[in-house]
Structure formats: structure tokens, C-alpha cells
């Protein structure tokens, strides 16, 4: 298995392309100059394209991924209705979802042969929209509206339109600020990191009564932390055993173990990391975690070790200015 790591640095308008080997070492393959401040990125389900959101001219760009070394070649672009904060796709590679914090909306762009061709739908009124997350069954889009302390739920229609479900939302505690999400591999639970109180909520997708229910809320900060809370990103290992979330003020990554059924998280430890970690990701082998420091202008590679999933630093690498996003592609 080959793996490529992509890092987005909006201040220098660059994507760095890295090869990740089995020992956790990164080798620079390419530096791509992007026509705009590049922020969110996602790889297409078929591994052939990288989709990126740019500003100040709000667009989604598509880059072809070379099958031999992961290098990028520009392929197409499509306009967006707001500054892109988060980007994702459905599991069949038919649609791109873009959440916009500043515009307070989520948009759906149709893909044709892997390329963005037209805007299909826009849902407004999502104050502080920070991500769009499709469930493993490809039916429901979870959209956290950070400033409203709610996660809105939409059914994805066959033609890409978003239809509000009943109930249309679930709510966090006041002042939590739901931000990013991941789903457990067993499809029974979702985990949401809350930016403003640096907590993680565990959502059961369907309890015995057929309802969505928050079954656990866990503080992700050390007991003696007294500064402003500013959580950012969250990811789970492919086997569902370990979960990680980062806080930018503390510049740390919190390590969680996940119960076998996915319903309970336990804090295992805290890993100091690059200054102001805005984004990170986990490789497909479950062996390595790569974190980006928005203020250090570096990325760090950590080995995931032992039954607790604790992190051991393997190396750090200079990237562009203000790195914010990390994605990993395996092929």
C-alpha cells in the first residue's frame, strides 16, 4: 500500500504533497501553488481526485491524483456560495458538500466523472456552519451550526437536494459550539468535537426508541487547564479503537480509547504538539497521525502505540505558511 499526505497552507497558497513510508517518514513529492487561500481538502472515494476549497474567490478546485506518486494536476473548478470552511463528499462520489462558517450555509455541488460541474442546492440559516458529514449509509448529512449549538439533519435525495429530517436537528449544551464530526466504523455512533468548551459528544444514531441520543459528553482538556478553550479537529482510527481531538490554545492532542461497541470514550492521555493545531489526520494503516501547526508552520508525524493509542513523535517537517488541513490517501 502506498500512502500520500496532502497539507494545505492558506497563507502561502500551497499544497505540499508527501510520500509516507512504512516507517512513518515523509518525503516531499511536490509543492503546488494554488490560485487562492487553500483550506479544506478531501480525497474522492475512488482516490482519483483531490477536492480543495479556496478563497477569497470562493471555489472548489479538483486536482487529478497521479496513481504512481500522488502528485497533483489541476482538472476543474466550480463556484461556491460562501467561503469554504469544510469539504466532504458522499460515499459514491456523486456530490461535494461544503460548509461555510462565514456565510452560514451548506452547499451541494454535483460531480460528473469526478469533476465539479454545477451547484445543486444551498441551505441557509446555519449560523457558524462548520462541517458537513454524511452517514456511512450515505443517507443523512449531519451539519453542525456552531453558533446555534445544534447539529442539523438532512436526508440526501438522489438528485443531491437536502431535505430536513424529522426531527430536523439535535442540540448540544448551551455554549458548546459543535464543529467537526466522525462516525464509528460500526455505524452506530457519531462523535462531535465542540469548539467553545473543548468537549466531545457521543451520539447514538438510533437508540432502542429509534431516536438520536447523546449518550456521553467528555471533557477533552487536562484538569488544571484554565485558559480559553478552542478545540478544532477530531478523527478516529480505521478500526474504531482510538479517537483523537485537538485544542489550539493548549496545542495538544487528546487521546481517547473507544469501547468495543463505540458507546463510551475514556481519556488515555495528552500529547503536546505543534503550535495551534488546526487540523490533523490518521493514515490508513492506523499506525501514524499527522498534525499541522498553524503557528509553527510545520507538520509532525506521530506513531500510534500500544493498547492505549498514545502518540510518539517520529519527525517534524516544514511546510507552507499557516498549515490548516491534512488528508491522507492510500492506493
UniProtKB/Swiss-Prot annotation:
Matching entries from Pfam families are given as:
Lactonase
GO molecular-function term, one example from the UniProt record: 6-phosphogluconolactonase activity
Q: Which GO terms describe its cellular component?
A: cytosol
Top-level EC class as recorded in UniProt: hydrolase
Q: In which pathway does it act?
A: Carbohydrate degradation; pentose phosphate pathway; D-ribulose 5-phosphate from D-glucose 6-phosphate (oxidative stage): step 2/3
* Reaction catalysis annotation: 6-phospho-D-glucono-1,5-lactone + H2O = 6-phospho-D-gluconate + H(+)
Query: Does the keyword section mention Hydrolase?
Result: yes
Tell me which Gene Ontology terms the entry assigns under biological process.
glucose metabolic process; pentose-phosphate shunt, oxidative branch
Q: What is its EC number?
A: 3.1.1.31
Q: Which UniProt keywords apply?
A: Carbohydrate metabolism, Glucose metabolism, Hydrolase
Q: Which family does it belong to?
A: Belongs to the cycloisomerase 2 family.
Under the heading PANTHER family, the entry gives: 6-PHOSPHOGLUCONOLACTONASE, 6-PHOSPHOGLUCONOLACTONASE-RELATED
* NCBIfam families in the cross-refs: PRK11028.1
What does the function comment of this entry state?
Answer: Catalyzes the hydrolysis of 6-phosphogluconolactone to 6-phosphogluconate.
Q: What name does this protein carry?
A: 6-phosphogluconolactonase
According to its UniProt entry, this protein's organism is Salmonella typhi
What is the primary gene name for this protein?
pgl
Amino acid at each position: 500500500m502506498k500512502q500520500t499526505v496532502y497539507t494545505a497552507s492558506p497563507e502561502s497558497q500551497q499544497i505540499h504533497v508527501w510520500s509516507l513510508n512504512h516507517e512513518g517518514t515523509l518525503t516531499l513529492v511536490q509543492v503546488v501553488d494554488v490560485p487562492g487561500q487553500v483550506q479544506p481538502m478531501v480525497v474522492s472515494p475512488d482516490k482519483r481526485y483531490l477536492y480543495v476549497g479556496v478563497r477569497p474567490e470562493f471555489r472548489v478546485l479538483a486536482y487529478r491524483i497521479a496513481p504512481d506518486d500522488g502528485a497533483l494536476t489541476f482538472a476543474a473548478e466550480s463556484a461556491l456560495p460562501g467561503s469554504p470552511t469544510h469539504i466532504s463528499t458522499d460515499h459514491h462520489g456523486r456530490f461535494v458538500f461544503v460548509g461555510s462558517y462565514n456565510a452560514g450555509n451548506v452547499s451541494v455541488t454535483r460531480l460528473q466523472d469526478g469533476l465539479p460541474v454545477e451547484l445543486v442546492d444551498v441551505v441557509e440559516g446555519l449560523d457558524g456552519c462548520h462541517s458537513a458529514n454524511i452517514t456511512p449509509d450515505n443517507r443523512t448529512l449531519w451539519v453542525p451550526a456552531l453558533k446555534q449549538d445544534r447539529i442539523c439533519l438532512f436526508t440526501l435525495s438522489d438528485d443531491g437536494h437536502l431535505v430536513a429530517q424529522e426531527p430536523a436537528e439535535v442540540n448540544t449544551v448551551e455554549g458548546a459550539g459543535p464543529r467537526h464530526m466522525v462516525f464509528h466504523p460500526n455505524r452506530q455512533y457519531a462523535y462531535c468535537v465542540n469548539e467553545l468548551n473543548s468537549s466531545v459528544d457521543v451520539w447514538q444514531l438510533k437508540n432502542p426508541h429509534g431516536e438520536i441520543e447523546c449518550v456521553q459528553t467528555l471533557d477533552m482538556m487536562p484538569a488544571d487547564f484554565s485558559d480559553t478553550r478552542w478545540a478544532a479537529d477530531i478523527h478516529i482510527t480505521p478500526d474504531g479503537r482510538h479517537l483523537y481531538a485537538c485544542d489550539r490554545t493548549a496545542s495538544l492532542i487528546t487521546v481517547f480509547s473507544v469501547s468495543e461497541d463505540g458507546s463510551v470514550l475514556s481519556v488515555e492521555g495528552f500529547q503536546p504538539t505543534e503550535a495551534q493545531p488546526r487540523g490533523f489526520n490518521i493514515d490508513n494503516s492506523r499506525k501514524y497521525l499527522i498534525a499541522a501547526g498553524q503557528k509553527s508552520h510545520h507538520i509532525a508525524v506521530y506513531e500510534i502505540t500500544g493498547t492505549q493509542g498514545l502518540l510518539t513523535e517520529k519527525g517534524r517537517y516544514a511546510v507552507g505558511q499557516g498549515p490548516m488541513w491534512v488528508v491522507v490517501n492510500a492506493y
